[in-house]
Amino acid sequence: MAAELVEKDIAKVASGKEEGVRLVVKALISSGVAMSIAGTSRPASGGEHKFSHWLDSNCETPALHGEQCGLGSIVTMYLHGGNWEKIRDTLKAVNAPINSSELGIDDDIVLNAFLNSKEIRPQRVTILDKSNQKQIEEAALATSVIG
């Protein structure tokens, strides 16, 4: 629901005006409510967050958390067989990074983050934990997150 709120009115969000900011805040509150109901951050935190936390722990200069999660969302959605292009296009519409170069982190480090993210919160199993190296490399290349 939270992502849909932003996606359906991405032009308003991209404008940076109050109406767009309100949409983002509404989406964040919605996400927070889902986490409160579940009693865990799981509804809003999957492989993309484990990817981001790995970068935070292993990069000399990590990027912004949301930007890292955005990149992680592209690859994890690809692995799920979902509409990763919609995520990429939504990020692009707000001038967010959509590949490792734009994120400012080398391809090798980004790929290592996807491959080694299972080290982060190992009790939280995500699509990255269930994917092998070949699948992850294919996803990162097919989505142009690396390459």
Predicted feature residues:
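Active-site segments that bind and position negatively charged phosphate/pyrophosphate groups
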Residues: 1-95, 101, 105
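C-terminal charged capping/lid subdomain of soluble metabolic enzymes
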Residues: 81-147
